[in-house]
């Protein structure tokens, strides 16, 4: 590059064009400030001019951010975002990274809209003029600083710094073994120019106390209300000596790339701690507290740790590993990534390409201010290494520290690539730290910095022409693709198939495996042919439809789609092993066609053209029901009522007030939320009538942590629902279920008609809700004469859901009989059964077995297996044909 980027202190910011947002960012500094700079004015002006040029170039080449339809109905629907961002956690909260080729196209400075985003909850909606930052704790003068006061009364520093999430490259971890984090790719880092006021100046102004008086840590707290730990703010801390160290360049930043911070990046003010992981740089900064101990936030202890490989989440909770200080992450480690060749790039092998060198390129960074001093590439698995050329635009600060990534490149012969099985890269820093050859797994999937490997395979892109196709280890988020995903599943199959074992070790494409395009898979979306995609593999589940314990709908609602995230969210390890029996091939993407265009998209690291996803016109058909099979719909929490200490009635609004839900009687829905960075899906049956317009109701029992010894963490979904504020939005998917009541004694079971004049309805715990729904539908139709006999089992009286409604209906309608069974009575005067469901209870309270009698049941599997089914059989019920299990 023509110049280097310096790390200096400036009196006015480097970019004269600032978007209008209220404050004046060109405020001159008081003349008595020590600018703490060792450079002369000429050098300073040259550096500022160069930074301005880089920022203007980055901003000019980025399309405008827009309101994203994926945010509609969420608390973030007011925030413009770049449409190319790869999202990790569904609709909300927003977490994502920019496409890696686009980051490399922009180079040293990343446009703010393409910088990675890590949010734990909704983005606070903040006004500049109303915002204050409190500094308190072990200081002589606790103070609230307005934004204007911060800007006017302290010196400003402006410098470039690379921020990286500690989870960068985590998806590689998740391919080895699932961590508790979502799937970061290799674009979880980027460089911006940050402007703010030094933290040490603010702390000095407030009179920070000495270490001997207990001032050991400086904690930072954000503004957002989060569910973690039963409800908390995002907070973390650093040691006092770090906070006060002038060489660390720690600032309270209010500008990024010459503009005010974007909402996703912490507007109006955030922490910037160069050389540290992004998790220490609190956004929407609200409080700074000087303390004797580390920050006590849930997120300080339960995030950003590297625990030993044998420690899983359960062991970490049981033995307190989260609280051991030696495992906390602060400074970044050394890391490097190959960006050219990009994933699925094809290099044709012909007389022209073989006469020119191929340039392999990428980025590298280290932490703690350590300079990257060497990057090496190997084509033979580490036998020999080629030293790369480094492009380091940054100058060190006055203390010799480097805060930014650098770029590297090396030229290789194309014929050498043709004979290589893979390309791997490793970097070194000035402390002679380097990257390990193999991945070291940890439960949070943090700090992955093993050699970055790109596999090479021979392909025939067009008319017999030979080419090399390059494959990165993973693709970010829930995108399919990457050699690690393929090898993970091939290795499972190879245990019983020696042919597959051989193909895993081959440097060439596995041509024995059938491949399918996405368009081919989409056509198999019905009961006659139900295909799904999981981790890039195609499975035909048609023959499993009738055996699926959750009913055919749970497969059909995802048929013809990539359902990786949902499959992982709701299936056990046993189910994942069963999946292999149904694998029929791999998902492929359409290769480059050398005759289709005059442009060459592949060859020598060209980055002058970045293909963007075409904009398609979407015409939304008018509809009267909310639920759309295979799609998630956003629903807003309208009200929440506490029925008891652990039972809640939730009312959710449908996307439009005039819509019916579109859920048949007997069917259920999935609620989809993201909790602790993982998708959580649970099935619920609404208690509201299917005829209600604009909303639906759920009665939910909240399973709190620490109550039941077998489930010390409680219920993930129920606790999350209980923590939601009014106005929160979650996703709903459905309808699901194999049983549908169509009225007047008629059912459809797996699509086949059934009829009954009498129903034995056996429920346990929260399994009452589908029974309740059928009862409600029958009673609403005065011409439906179906007899209903409900036996409802619970632990105690307090656990009985919907008792008032059931009792009222039983008094009003002769065709409904209700009987309760509880394990133990906690009050005198209980007039129903105590114990478990027995033959004698059923003999007395349900109808005799007959051809026109059906038994319906829903509840815990042990209840159905050991109480309901055997006792019905004793009474002569044909449980194979006349017992319907929701």
UniProtKB/Swiss-Prot annotation:
Residues that coordinate or bind Mo-molybdopterin: 165
A single MF term (Gene Ontology): molybdenum ion binding
Cofactor: FAD; heme; Mo-molybdopterin
FAD-binding FR-type domain mapped to chain residues: 630-742
Binding, FAD: 682-685, 699-704, 711, 716-718, 769
Coiled coil start-end: none
Alphabetic keyword roster: Disulfide bond, FAD, Flavoprotein, Heme, Iron, Metal-binding, Molybdenum, NAD, Nitrate assimilation, Oxidoreductase
Keyword Cytoplasm listed: no
Protein name: Inducible nitrate reductase [NADH] 1
Catalytic activity: nitrite + NAD(+) + H2O = nitrate + NADH + H(+)
GO biological process, one term: nitric oxide biosynthetic process
Chain's role: Nitrate reductase is a key enzyme involved in the first step of nitrate assimilation in plants, fungi and bacteria.
EC number(s) on file: 1.7.1.1
Manner of cofactor binding, per the entry note: Binds 1 FAD. Binds 1 heme group. The heme group is called cytochrome b-557.
Family that this chain belongs to: Belongs to the nitrate reductase family.
Subunit comment: Homodimer.
Domain Cytochrome b5 heme-binding intervals: 513-588
Keyword hit for Oxidoreductase: yes
Chain sites annotated for binding heme: 548, 571
């Amino acid at each position: 590059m023509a110049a280097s980027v310096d790390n200096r202190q400036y009196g006015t910011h480097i970019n004269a064009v600032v978007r209008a947002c209220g404050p004046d960012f060109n405020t001159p500094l008081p003349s008595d400030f020590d600018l703490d700079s060792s450079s002369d004015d000429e050098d300073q002006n040259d550096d500022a001019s160069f930074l301005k040029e880089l920022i203007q170039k980055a901003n000019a080449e980025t399309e405008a951010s827009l309101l994203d339809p994926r945010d509609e109905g969420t608390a973030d629907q007011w925030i413009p975002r770049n449409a190319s961002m790869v999202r990790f956690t569904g609709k909300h909260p927003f977490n994502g990274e920019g496409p890696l080729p686009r980051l490399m196209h922009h180079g040293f400075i990343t446009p703010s809209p393409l910088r990675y985003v890590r949010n734990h909850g909704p983005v606070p909606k903040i006004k500049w003029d109303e915002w204050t930052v409190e500094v308190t704790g072990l200081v002589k003068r606790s103070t609230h600083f307005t934004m204007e006061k911060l800007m006017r009364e302290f010196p400003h520093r402006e410098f470039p710094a690379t921020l990286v999430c500690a989870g960068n490259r985590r998806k590689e971890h998740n391919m080895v073994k699932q961590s508790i984090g979502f799937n970061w790719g290799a674009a979880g880092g980027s460089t911006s120019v940050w402007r703010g006021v030094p933290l040490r100046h603010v702390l000095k102004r407030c009179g920070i106390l000495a270490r001997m008086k207990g001032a050991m840590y400086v904690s930072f707290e954000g503004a957002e209300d989060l569910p973690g730990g039963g409800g908390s703010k995002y907070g973390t801390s650093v040691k006092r000596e770090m906070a006060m160290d002038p060489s660390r360049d720690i600032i309270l930043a209010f500008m990024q790339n010459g503009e005010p911070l974007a909402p996703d990046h912490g507007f109006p003010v955030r922490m910037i701690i160069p050389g540290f992981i992004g998790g220490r740089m609190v956004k929407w900064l609200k409080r700074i507290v000087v303390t004797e101990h580390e920050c006590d936030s849930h997120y300080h202890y339960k995030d950003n740790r590297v625990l030993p490989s044998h420690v899983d989440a359960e062991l970490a909770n049981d033995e307190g590993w989260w609280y051991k200080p030696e495992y906390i992450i602060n400074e970044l480690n050394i890391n490097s990534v190959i960006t050219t060749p990009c994933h699925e790039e094809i290099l044709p092998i012909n007389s022209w390409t073989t006469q020119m060198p191929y340039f392999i390129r990428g980025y590298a960074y280290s932490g703690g201010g350590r300079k990257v001093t060497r990057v090496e590439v190997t084509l033979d698995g580490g036998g020999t290494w080629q030293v790369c050329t480094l492009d380091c635009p940054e100058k060190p600060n006055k203390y010799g520290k480097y805060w930014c990534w650098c770029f590297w490149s090396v030229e290789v012969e194309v014929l050498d690539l043709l004979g290589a099985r893979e390309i791997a890269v490793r970097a070194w820093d000035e402390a002679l730290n380097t990257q390990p050859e193999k991945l070291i797994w940890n439960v949070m999937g943090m700090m992955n910095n093993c050699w970055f490997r790109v596999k090479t395979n021979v392909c025939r892109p067009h008319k017999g022409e030979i080419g090399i196709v390059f494959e990165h280890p993973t693709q970010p988020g829930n995108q399919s693709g990457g050699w690690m995903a393929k090898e993970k599943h091939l290795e499972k199959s190879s245990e019983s198939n020696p042919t597959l074992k051989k193909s895993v070790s081959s440097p060439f494409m596995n041509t024995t495996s059938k491949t399918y395009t996405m368009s081919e898979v989409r056509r198999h979306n019905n009961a006659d042919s139900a295909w799904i995609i999981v981790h890039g593999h195609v499975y035909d589940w048609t023959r499993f439809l009738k055996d699926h314990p959750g009913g055919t709908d749970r497969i059909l609602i995802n048929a013809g789609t990539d359902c990786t995230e949902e499959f992982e969210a709701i299936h056990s390890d046993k189910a994942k092993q069963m999946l292999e029996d149904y694998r029929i091939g791999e998902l492929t993407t359409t290769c480059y066609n050398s005759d289709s265009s005059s442009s060459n998209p592949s060859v020598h690291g060209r980055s002058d053209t970045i293909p963007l996803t075409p904009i398609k016109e979407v015409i939304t058909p008018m509809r009267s029901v909310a639920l759309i099979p295979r799609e998630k719909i956003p629903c807003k929490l309208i009200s929440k009522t506490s029925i008891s200490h652990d039972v809640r009635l939730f009312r959710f609004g449908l996307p439009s007030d005039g819509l019916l839900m579109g859920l048949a009687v007997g069917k259920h829905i999935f609620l989809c939320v993201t909790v602790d960075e993982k998708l959580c899906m649970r099935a619920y049956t609404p208690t509201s009538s299917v005829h209600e317009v604009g909303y639906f109701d759920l009665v939910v029992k909240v399973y709190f942590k620490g109550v039941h010894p077998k489930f010390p963490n409680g219920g993930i979904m129920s606790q999350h629902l209980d923590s939601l504020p009014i106005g929160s939005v979650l996703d709903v998917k459905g309808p699901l279920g194999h049983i549908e009541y169509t009225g007047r004694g008629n059912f459809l079971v797996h699509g086949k008609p059934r009829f009954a004049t009498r129903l034995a309805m056996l429920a346990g715990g929260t399994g009452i809700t589908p029974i309740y729904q059928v009862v409600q539908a029958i009673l609403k139709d005065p011409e439906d004469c179906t007899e209903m006999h409900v036996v409802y089992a619970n632990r105690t009286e307090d656990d009985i859901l919907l008792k008032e409604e059931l009792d009222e209906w039983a008094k009003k309608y002769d065709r409904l009989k209700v009987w309760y069974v509880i394990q133990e009575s906690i009050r005198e005067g209980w007039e129903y059964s105590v114990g478990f469901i027995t033959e004698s209870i059923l003999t007395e309270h349900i109808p005799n077995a007959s051809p026109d009698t059906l038994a319906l049941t829903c509840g815990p599997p042990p209840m159905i297996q050991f109480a309901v089914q055997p006792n019905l059989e004793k009474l002569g019920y044909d449980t194979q044909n006349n017992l319907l299990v929701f």
